Regions:
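Hydrophobic, lipid-facing positions within transmembrane beta-strands of outer-membrane proteins
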Residues: 2-8, 144-150, 222-227
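Conserved small-residue
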Residues: 4, 11-138
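Repeated loop/turn-to-beta-strand initiation elements of outer-membrane beta-barrel proteins
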Residues: 4, 16, 156-161, 234-235
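Extracytoplasmic loops and strand-loop junctions of Gram-negative outer membrane beta-barrel proteins
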Residues: 7-9, 127-136, 140, 195, ...
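Transmembrane beta-strands of outer-membrane beta-barrel pores
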Residues: 10-12, 26-32, 154-156, 165-169, ...
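Transmembrane beta-strands of outer-membrane beta-barrel proteins
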Residues: 20-22, 148, 154, 159-161, ...
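Transmembrane beta-barrel strands of outer-membrane/channel proteins
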Residues: 22-28, 152, 161-165, 189, ...
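Extracytoplasmic gating/loop element in the C-terminal half of outer-membrane beta-barrel translocons
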Residues: 166-241
């Protein structure tokens, strides 16, 4: 576990009545598992992997939305024939091993017959079914965080605000697929570049839809906005305060 923390204060402008001061902070942290019990390189119950951080997600990766095209319909049939998986146009597609089509009879290949009688021979590299080999590692912790506080003082008035930065992490948000209000940008035959899947009650494989919920946690947030006034001491003295 290694990290760096830096802080810096600067006075950008200073006159008789006006001062602008900025306080900067920056931190980065890198953690990696060096070894696991019994010399293992991974423990999926954690999940923990040598060479990777402790605080991670280990899951499938969202690819795109299935389209109603010849190519995608062929792929969806292959998933049905190979892995008994039912996918539909307008639903979420998950990253898998690549489809490698080869001549029939190629060593290490398999052959399936599509509904129209077409034969498809492919390398048996894991395509068509989802296993641990298809999962990826998502880092929950940001690669770096930072902030800056700007303070502006004019005579007895002060205005300040704090800006927070965070980059390089992934979070899991259920609002992408569960409990979300009806979105306008959902897939349809006339809106094929939509961000969200088409609502449906059709029978399909939805086991892997959760992969859509992983989202980059990069953010810039302005908070702690404050405006204050300092009552002059002579005024307080005058009224005995």
């Amino acid at each position: 576990n290694k990290g760096v923390e830096l802080s810096l204060s600067t006075i950008n402008v200073k006159t008789r009545d006006f001062t602008w001061q900025t306080d900067w902070t920056f931190s980065t942290n890198s953690e990696k598992i060096k070894e696991l019990a019994n010399g293992s390189m991974q423990d999926t119950s954690g999940p923990w992997f040598v060479g990777h951080p402790i605080n991670i997600f280990w899951d499938y990766k969202y690819d795109r939305i299935w389209q109603d095209t010849l190519e995608d319909n062929k792929m969806m049939q292959l998933y049905q024939k190979i892995g008994n998986l039912t996918f539909l146009p307008g639903q979420y597609k998950i990253c898998d091993q690549p489809l490698e089509e080869v001549p029939e009879g190629t060593e290490g290949s398999k052959t399936v017959i599509l509904d129209d009688g077409t034969k498809v021979s492919y390398m048996d590299n894991g395509f068509g079914r989802f296993t641990d080999d298809d999962k990826v590692i998502y880092n929950k912790s940001p690669k770096w965080t930072g902030g800056l506080n700007n303070s502006f003082t004019y005579k007895d008035w002060n205005f300040s605000f704090f800006t927070y930065f965070r980059f390089g992490n992934t979070y899991y948000g259920l609002s992408q697929t569960i409990g979300r209000r009806l979105e306008k940008d959902v897939w349809s035959p006339t809106n094929t570049n939509a961000k969200f899947a088409q609502p449906t009650t059709a029978t399909r494989t939805s086991t892997y839809d959760g992969a859509r919920n992983y989202t980059k946690g990069n953010m810039v947030l302005v908070r702690n906005i404050a405006l204050s006034y300092t009552v002059p001491q002579k005024f307080l003295n005058k009224y005995g305060i």
